[in-house]
Design a protein with these regions (language model features):
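Short membrane-interface helical motifs at transmembrane helix boundaries
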Residues: 98-121
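Hydrophobic alpha-helical transmembrane segments
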Residues: 156-170, 178-209
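N-terminal membrane topogenesis motif
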Residues: 1-23, 79, 83, 220-241
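Transmembrane-helix boundary and interhelical linker motifs in polytopic inner-membrane proteins
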Residues: 4, 53-90, 145-151
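Small-residue-rich midsections of specific transmembrane alpha-helices
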Residues: 44-69, 73, 92, 129-133, ...
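Alpha-helical transmembrane segments of multi-pass membrane proteins
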Residues: 117-140
Length: 283
């Protein structure tokens, strides 16, 4: 039985990942045709900051939730399982809140000093709005993995991608005439709205799933030290992710800056960066 569930979950993850990757490539090609290589370059710069902020917001908490919730489920305790999830959400909301304030109020500073492009400011102000929802979604995904239910995660990601594409098509079509800054902001707004939609889906599925935990009658372990246990698991994982994401963000910021030093100029440098990072590498 366990082997069958493992194979089923592995197949669901594999198929959903392939679909997401294929659809993502097709979408990137369409987006590049609409906003051009320079627009893709600007979006990639902003997206680098987005990924760094998302790494801080999620804080490697999903793995901690999966492990600790699985332990509580093995003991047959609903209260302990939900307490783990509640504490994890509290931690991720605190970290996400700090990240939201930092990025939102530091948008102009980040755009001018790091990205070297003032057009990124509107997108950077929109960017952090979805981070708390992304953090909670990460916790819920960890919970569903502990429950050995991969379908909610896969379905939410597929529908999130569908919503993202629809929203970006509509928003970019509406704002693309107002400049590349507006285009980048429209894309980030579509990304953020899709993340919020994914959270709502996972939350509704979670509400329904928790009713099935009522038959768990095991005795919960003492609640002391839950935060410490979560941090003990998540901090080592998070440290590596922070470093990896920070290095990639630094690379994406430095490449167009250095390309701009050569004769083809700043705008062409951003176009070259867009062709490399946003168009060639994804394929």
């Amino acid at each position: 039985m366990k082997k069958t569930i493992f194979i089923k979950n592995a197949l669901i993850l594999t198929v959903s990942s392939l679909i997401l990757r294929f659809v993502g490539i097709i979408f990137k090609v369409w987006l590049a045709q609409l906003i051009g290589s320079e627009g893709i370059g600007l979006y990639q710069l902003i997206f680098s900051v987005y990924m760094l902020a998302a790494t801080f917001a999620t804080s490697g908490i999903s793995t901690a939730v999966t492990r600790l919730a699985a332990e509580e489920l093995a003991l047959g305790t609903k209260r302990g399982t939900l307490k783990i999830l509640r504490r994890a959400i509290e931690i991720t909301l605190i970290v996400a809140g700090v990240t939201v304030v930092t990025v939102f109020f530091g948008a102009e500073f980040i755009a001018v000093r790091f990205l070297n492009d003032i057009r990124a400011v509107p997108a950077l102000k929109i960017l952090p709005l979805s981070l708390p929802f992304m953090g909670i979604s990460s916790c819920l995904r960890g919970y569903f993995i502990a429950r050995r239910k991969i379908t909610p995660n896969a379905v939410s990601q597929l529908l999130e991608q569908a919503v993202r594409i629809i929203l970006i098509v509509v928003l970019v079509g509406k704002f693309c005439t107002k400049g590349l800054g507006a285009c980048a902001a429209a894309v980030i707004l579509g990304d953020s709205a899709a993340e919020i939609f994914s959270f709502l889906m996972l939350w509704l599925i979670w509400l329904r799933d928790t009713r099935k935990l009522d038959n768990l009658t095991g005795r919960a372990r003492p609640p002391f030290g839950i935060v410490r246990r979560i941090l003990h698991i998540s901090v080592p994982i998070t440290s590596g992710r922070y470093l990896n994401t920070a290095l990639r963000t630094g690379e994406n910021i430095l490449v167009p800056k250095n390309l701009a030093k050569y004769p083809f100029g700043g705008e062409n440098a951003l176009s070259q960066f867009g062709m490399i990072k946003g168009m060639a590498l994804p394929i």
